Amino acid sequence: MQRYNFKTAEEKWQKIWKEKKSFKTSIKKNKKKFYCLEMFPYPSGNIHMGHVRNYTIGDVLARYKKLNGFNVLHPMGWDSFGMPAENAARENNLHPMMWTKKNIETMKRQLKLLGLSIDWDREISTCNPEYYKHQQKFFLEMYEKGLVKKKENYVNWDPVDKTVLANEQVINGKGWRSGATVERKKLSQWFFEITKFSQQLLDSLENLENWPNKVKLMQKNWIGRSLGCEINFEILGSNQVKKISCFSTRPDTLFGLSFLAISVDHPVSKFYENNKEFINFKNECSKTGTTEEALAKAEKIGFKTNLIAINPLDKNMKAPVYIANFVLMDYGLGAIFGCPAHDQRDLDFAIKYKLQVNPVVLPPNEDKKKFKINKQAYTGEGEIINSKLLNGLSAPDKSVSKTISILEEKKIGKGKINFRLKDWGISRQRYWGCPIPIVYKKNGDIIPVPKKDLPITLPKDVDLNCKGNPLDHHRTWKYTKINNEEVIRETDTLDTFVDSSWYFLRFCSPHNLNYGYDNEDLNYWMPVDQYIGGVEHAILHLLYSRFFMRAIAYQNNNFKYVEPFSGLFTQGMVCHETYKDEKGKWVSRDEIELVNDKTFVKKGSREKVIVGPAEAMSKSKKNIIDPENVIQNLGADTIRWFILSDSPPGKDIQWSEEGISASFKFIQKLWNLNLNIINRKGKKTDENEDDKLEKYTIKMF
């Protein structure tokens, strides 16, 4: 039996594909189109098994469509701006561009080893000025349309990366890249006004029939549409403050009122700005992040004012007003009324400050006389109690709408739809990102950079070891002239998620020098027919891309697309066993050996190793497998076959030596089967030979 020489075969065919430009995109008008795209990679240094799985899935689909007569667009690019390059440049004393280019060369070579059917003529890189000059144009156009604003706001500050994070980039209260505990800081920032499209983004989810339901649900919850009410509270105790308005999704619990809580940035707080106790309290608040998650986990603290709020539905019911760390100015009206019996956050606060807890929703099958709230708030459905004119109403289905009607009738409240989604903060205090095409006059006036002066490129002679933003310290770049007037450049750069919010458009017209895309190309290729990537991007990249399409289409009759991806597939993770030594430190597979077929120990020391569960491959857990080593030893077809066949592509897959060995044997069997078929075809002796070959093939499989 002849052995399959995968190195010879792979080198031969990859050479043929390159010479014949087999995967170059062509457009034949009599054929249907198929745009297949996997989420493009960050050039971190080497490809990993997640890349192998992602791009192999897309490659099989692209090849299948091409064989079925489609015009296929299957491109590749690099999401090449970002903090890791800047950090690596500092550590290795080299420029981020050098580090990035070297990594791109390495990863491109590795991807080619996989034999992917990629049109490399359309390759793009987001750190290339030929790419980001178009992004700067988009920014200016959105600024002209009123979709970009600069405003002061509390932001999520990563103290390690020393940059701002969007809410979506804070995971479990920590920075998505650095892992540092996020702090709250007030800065003047640029924002994309994504909230203008909240309802559109929500409604259009229903039209995405070829998206996973879990992704649509995640976006729906993140957008967070809620029907509530603005309620006006009369205030006692001050000649300066007569009224405070709150937003609530549960106005029906007004008779459970225990306190009012307002944000540290609420206009009322200015009356306490010279109070030492309030100053200390405000400083303490800065240690809390701005995300709902961070606020939920933080200890609830408040500053008690001298103000008293009167319940608008019962003038005899009064409650103290606090300034609290868990209320944000950019949600609702920056003020809430606390009903501790039916909101856990409010209950924690009430217990801490010994405030009243009045139950107003009775759970089903509970005795009204015996029902009490201790340390757990009741947040379920029930019947309204202890609420005078609302008593007996079913909560919340009947009681909310009834309460809103009463408040509107009395002109002390108004029904309102609110969204959880916040405007997208896009300013980042880093060097290695797309420069924002804005300059400032000496008096602070904003001037958009003329489009003829684009791109605004990054200076090459930058000091990355200075504290804070390197661009802020580069005087010859920071201070410049526009129309012979001395101006100061914006030194923040754009969030890298902006770079990836439109790259799929650039692939349609990668060589267009005048604009980011060509309408004729877009009219043929868009939307992407099949997009492939991780579910972790559901409320980041996937939501931002949907917004970006709408932002381009806004007041633009030449752009008709609102959804970038008609089909979405989210692949599972590639997992591997984890190993720890007796001190609890992660150990790699290369550092251990098996003794007596049952015990793992560290090589050399013979220290016992604890085998943990299979987890997603990561450098930090030292459970990665180098794809290039597997390709060099077993061939690209082996790794591709294993990654596709061992588990459904939407599920996690566990890497195993047994599985990859079995895949190698299968490829050998397939090779020999084909050789036998070819040989028997050449020696065809009777008319029934084709039937015999078919039976033989089935038997061999």
Annotate the PLM regions.
Residues M1-L37, K66-P75, W99-K108, N210, ...:
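Conserved oxyanion/phosphate-binding beta-strand-loop segments in alpha/beta enzyme cores
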Residues K282-N306, D314-K315, L355-P363, L389-E409, ...:
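Conserved catalytic alpha/beta cores of large enzymes that bind or transform nucleotide phosphates
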Residues Y42-L73, I171-W176, N280, Y331-N365, ...:
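Conserved active-site neighborhood of enzyme catalytic/cofactor-binding cores
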Residues G58, N71, H266-P363, Q376-Y378:
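Catalytic alpha/beta core of large soluble enzyme barrels
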